[in-house]
């Protein structure tokens, strides 16, 4: 049995990389590289996504090592205290979790793979959202023991939202109880995917030492230091029958959705290896099939084969249709398809998907969708037409930057000095003004009061809040005038705690966080018809506005937004006054009538009204809308909406009787309580699902607690005293 030693081209890749760039830190100037323009079919943009602790970052570390991007591997919670390359934040290394997405790229046998490693914790889900928005494919990492877990559902929804094709890598096959069949069952029955194994593990638990490649029909063993040598051999005798059965199952699942393979299957023709690979690629790109691979990143097994599958099965940028909205000469909007050609025949179009404060200023991450972007180019923001010059252009490798001169369609790059917001589209054509669809931003679910420990740190406190709220759209702040305190809102306790720790470590500003509170919303319980007249005469120019219509509660799937529509006929209310009405609505919904939480889930429909030629000014119409809403606070039926969370608790069977479901307000500090109830053996994860009305009893209790907190008397008690 002569081993066919196949090295993963590590030495060659390292030589190539060292010839074209050198990494630089904040203390040294970058060197410039001018790479050749790689063909579009040799580009892959992928994300590594998974439930927390499934091994995403370890998988990425192995990819970097086998591709020659790093010289040695380090673990997330390694004894050497170095930490994984992609977890470059100090807090990430301390906690052993990924907090923010990190970008890098590798060369794998002539294919450039741009990689974004994303967090697994639900509190940082916006990092996954903005990564998947700009990626063409993904690797979904599942734990061989846990299979499909709570956060897997969230990632699956995000993949579907952005129509991202993916392959599945079942990790941790060396652990006791690991099996790819559990993951396969979860993909099929929990996530409703057409999935099949393309790998069978060789050896169970700690004896796992290789895989059977069901497509190629041979065994692969990963040997040598760090698993660098991939040895090809015959399939072990005890696995040959199962391998044949699983291969047939694989072909059947593909044939169900692929016309070419389906015809061969019906005609009893056996497809060859090339035909199976091509069919897998066709169906993966169309999101009709999910191939399931196996391995153990920690034990250095299966990762090279997984990278090969990324190149074989996931789409290049030309195979993904990307669209933008532009305005025609008549002012109408139309959708255009962006060209993936890697040249400057068409104007540059790029999406700023992530902001990060660096030592050189704001770092803006871009996905180039069309044309090319070069250092020194002038680009225009589609939102407001402002003109910006690209002074520096870099590619990211975790915390390091490698300066480049030009980025082409399909590339992911970053630039400095671009004052913009996440989700903005830029173009080199001032007249094009394209708008790429932005990413989904989930609503915050908890709030905390926050203040600096020392008054002298007030300036740094404001700077930190301003920066963090700009970088992270799920981290929000507001100032409570009554309580005279700053309130921050986010996706969970960990989310807010991390920002508190970052204020201390990055701004030397220790802060105190108050008790968590639920981010309630206020909504109408039933439609409310209104006919409201605002009239004010003070000696000078008066104010006049009259509006008639209805406020409807929105359905459950849209109850986090406020909608406004003009349903008038004729010109009783001139069209140029509707922006003022909308402005008044946007301001008044910040505080509802129950506990001054934000109003959501309503649709204000203006059906008729009246105006005055002189007195119906912008401020008059703003006041008309706001006073109508204040009247509705008194007359309409209002409800509290609370966040409904999906909670997954993992605990030994003997402790299950002690673990019960709770309201979100009862889940604060639940980690400590669960550890106490389960002798430290229980774990739980929680993610936002939707907003729904509270019970009337809960609403009364929340209102009473809010009034007590703010020293406000119960209006019902006042009424009782008057009657006496």
Curated annotation (Swiss-Prot):
Name of the protein described by the UniProt record: Elongation factor G, mitochondrial
Chief localization: mitochondrion
Gene Ontology MF terms: GTP binding; GTPase activity; translation elongation factor activity
Source species of the chain: Caenorhabditis briggsae
Keyword Hydrolase: yes
Function: Mitochondrial GTPase that catalyzes the GTP-dependent ribosomal translocation step during translation elongation. During this step, the ribosome changes from the pre-translocational (PRE) to the post-translocational (POST) state as the newly formed A-site-bound peptidyl-tRNA and P-site-bound deacylated tRNA move to the P and E sites, respectively. Catalyzes the coordinated movement of the two tRNA molecules, the mRNA and conformational changes in the ribosome.
GO cellular component: mitochondrion
Binding site for GTP: 50-57, 117-121, 171-174
Pathways involved: Protein biosynthesis; polypeptide chain elongation
Residue range covered by the transit peptide: 1-24
EC number: 3.6.5.-
Reaction(s) catalysed (UniProt annotation): GTP + H2O = GDP + phosphate + H(+)
Any one of the GO BP annotations: mitochondrial translational elongation
Gene (name only): gfm-1
Alphabetical UniProt keywords: Elongation factor, GTP-binding, Hydrolase, Mitochondrion, Nucleotide-binding, Protein biosynthesis, Transit peptide
Gene3D superfamilies, alphabetized: 3.30.230.10, 3.30.70.240, Elongation Factor G (Translational Gtpase), domain 3, P-loop containing nucleotide triphosphate hydrolases, Translation factors
Localization of this protein: Mitochondrion
Domain tr-type G: 41-318
Cross-referenced NCBIfam families: EF-G, small_GTP
Family per record: Belongs to the TRAFAC class translation factor GTPase superfamily. Classic translation factor GTPase family. EF-G/EF-2 subfamily.
Record-linked CDD domains: EF-G (cd01886), EFG_III (cd16262), mtEFG1_II_like (cd04091)
Alphabetical list of Pfam families matching this protein: EFG_C (PF00679), EFG_III (PF14492), EFG_IV (PF03764), GTP_EFTU (PF00009), GTP_EFTU_D2 (PF03144)
InterPro entries registered for this protein in UniProt: EFG_II, EFG_III, EFG_III/V, EFG_V-like, EFTu-like_2, G_TR_CS, P-loop_NTPase, Ribosomal_Su5_D2-typ_SF
């Amino acid at each position: 049995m002569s081993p066919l030693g196949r090295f993963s081209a590590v030495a060659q890749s390292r030589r190539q990389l060292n010839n074209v760039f050198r990494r630089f830190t904040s203390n040294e100037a970058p060197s410039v590289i001018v790479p050749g323009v790689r063909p579009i079919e040799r580009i892959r943009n992928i994300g590594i996504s998974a439930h927390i602790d499934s091994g995403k970052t370890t998988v990425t570390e192995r990819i970097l090592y086998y591709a020659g991007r790093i010289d040695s591997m380090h673990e997330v919670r390694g004894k050497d205290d170095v930490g994984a390359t992609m977890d470059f934040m100090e807090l990430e290394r301390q906690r052993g979790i990924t907090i923010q997405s990190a970008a890098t790229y590798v060369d794998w046998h002539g294919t450039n793979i741009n990689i974004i490693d994303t967090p697994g914790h639900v509190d940082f889900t916006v990092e996954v959202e903005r990564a998947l928005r700009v990626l063409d494919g993904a690797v979904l990492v599942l734990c061989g023991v846990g299979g499909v877990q709570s956060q897997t559902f969230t990632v699956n929804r995000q993949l579907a939202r952005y129509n991202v094709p993916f392959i599945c890598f079942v990790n941790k096959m060396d652990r006791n109880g690991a099996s790819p069949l559990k993951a396969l069952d979860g993909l099929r029955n929990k996530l409703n995917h057409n999935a099949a194994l393309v790998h069978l593990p060789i050896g169970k638990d700690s004896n796992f030492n290789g895989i059977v490649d069901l497509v190629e029909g041979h065994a692969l063993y990963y040997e040598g230091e760090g698993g660098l040598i991939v040895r090809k051999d015959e399939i072990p005798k005890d696995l040959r029958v199962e391998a044949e059965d699983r291969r047939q199952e694989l072909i059947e699942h593909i044939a169900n959705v692929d016309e070419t393979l389906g015809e061969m299957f019906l005609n009893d023709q056996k497809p060859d290896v090339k035909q199976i690979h091509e069919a897998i690629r066709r169906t993966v790109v169309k999101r009709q099939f999910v191939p399931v691979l196996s391995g153990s990143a920690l034990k250095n097994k299966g990762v090279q084969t997984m990278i090969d599958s990324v190149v074989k099965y996931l789409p290049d940028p030309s195979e993904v249709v990307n669209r933008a909205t532009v305005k025609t000469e008549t002012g109408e909007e139309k959708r255009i398809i962006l060209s993936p050609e890697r040249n400057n025949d068409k104007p540059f179009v790029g999406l700023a998907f992530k902001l990060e404060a660096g030592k050189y200023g704001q770092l803006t991450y871009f996905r180039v969708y069309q044309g090319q972007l070069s250092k020194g180019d002038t680009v225009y923001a589609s939102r407001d037409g402002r003109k910006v010059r690209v002074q520096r252009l870099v590619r990211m490798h975790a915390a390091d930057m490698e300066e480049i001169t030009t980025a082409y369609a399909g590339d992911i790059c970053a630039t400095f000095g671009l004052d913009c917001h996440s989700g903005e589209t830029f173009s080199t054509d001032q007249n094009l003004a394209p708008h790429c669809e932005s990413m989904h931003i989930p609503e915050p679910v908890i709030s905390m009061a926050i203040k600096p420990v020392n008054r002298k740190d007030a300036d740094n406190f404001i700077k930190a809040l301003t920066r963090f709220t700009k970088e992270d759209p799920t981290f929000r702040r507001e100032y409570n005038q009554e309580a005279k305190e700053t309130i921050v809102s986010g996706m969970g306790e960990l989310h807010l705690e991390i920002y508190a720790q970052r204020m201390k470590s990055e701004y030397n500003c220790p802060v105190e966080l108050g008790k968590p509170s639920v981010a309630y919303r206020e909504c109408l319980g039933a439609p409310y018809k209104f006919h409201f007249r605002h009239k004010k005469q003070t000696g000078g120019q008066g104010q006049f506005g009259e509006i008639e219509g209805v406020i409807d509660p929105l359905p459950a799937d849209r109850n986090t937004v406020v909608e406004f529509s003009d349903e008038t006929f004729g010109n009783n209310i001139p069209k140029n006054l509707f922006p003022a009405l909308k402005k008044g609505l946007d301001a008044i919904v910040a505080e509802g009538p129950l506990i001054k939480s934000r109003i959501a889930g309503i649709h204000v429909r203006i059906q008729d009204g009246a105006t005055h030629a002189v007195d119906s000014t912008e401020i008059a119409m703003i006041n008309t809308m706001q006073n109508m809403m204040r009247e509705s606070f008194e007359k309409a039926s209002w409800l509290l909406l609370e966040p409904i969370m999906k909670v997954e608790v993992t605990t030994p069977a003997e402790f299950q009787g002690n673990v019960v479901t709770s309201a979100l307000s009862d889940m604060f500090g639940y980690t400590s309580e669960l550890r106490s109830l389960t002798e430290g053996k229980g774990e739980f994860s929680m993610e936002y699902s939707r907003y729904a009305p509270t019970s009337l009893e809960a609403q009364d209790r929340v209102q009473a607690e809010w009034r007590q907190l703010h020293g406000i008397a119960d209006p019902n008690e006042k009424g009782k005293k008057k009657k006496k």
